[in-house]
Amino acid sequence: MAIAGVLFLLFLARQASAAGYGGWQSAHATFYGGGDASGTMGGACGYGNLYSQGYGTNTAALSTALFNDGAACGSCYELRCDNAGSSCLPGSITVTATNFCPPNYGLPSDDGGWCNPPRPHFDMAEPAFLHIAQYRAGIVPVSFRRVPCVKKGGVRFTVNGHSYFNLVLVTNVAGAGDVRSVSIKGSRTGWQPMSRNWGQNWQSNAFLDGQSLSFQVTASDGRTVTSNNVAHPGWQFGQTFEGGQF
């Protein structure tokens, strides 16, 4: 078991190196959403109920400098409290980007406008923040770095919309976590690129009713996973299907 654990850690390290995640950087962190993180549900990535989608409470909203117009949705970051004296707690926590922290140009960036460009900032779910700092701190300096996401099961595809407007929510992405591109294929069509509608909702205007559906997902590190015929021909809008994984 010990050898298996070491091999797994080495595998993650190789993934991080291959993706070019880089080293530690400096930012600040605050918290929102309440003690049960119920206020973090929904959000600009489109994940909806973070509990049922498997993201839980280890999540964060990213400032403009990190959010990248939604392209960063699903990426994972390791954070540790940095130089905040008695407010810091030892250790680190890994969070998934699930929301956007909007700028507040009415306040200076060092006094309330924490998410103003070009500041990197994490507005963490309260339970996640309390892993690295005390509640009374309110805001703390942190060190952060991109890390590979670890997920259970395969990439999930929730097919919403209607005929000629297929809106597919892509969730539970391991590895890089974020998604660069998605393609869709019906059993009677070829591969067709989808466009990012918002967050991790991807759009196709093709008529695909009554066809089995396949998906091809490419992450920001260039790796691609193809999930063939994951949705049977009788699929209905609102259903979720599980494919392969990175």
UniProtKB/Swiss-Prot annotation:
It is a peripheral membrane protein. Residues 1-18 form the signal peptide. It is found in: Secreted, Cell wall; Membrane. Residues 164-243 form the Expansin-like CBD domain. Residues 42-154 form the Expansin-like EG45 domain. It comes from the Eukaryota. This is Expansin-A4. It comes from Oryza sativa subsp. indica (Rice). The lineage of its organism: Eukaryota, Viridiplantae, Streptophyta, Embryophyta, Tracheophyta.
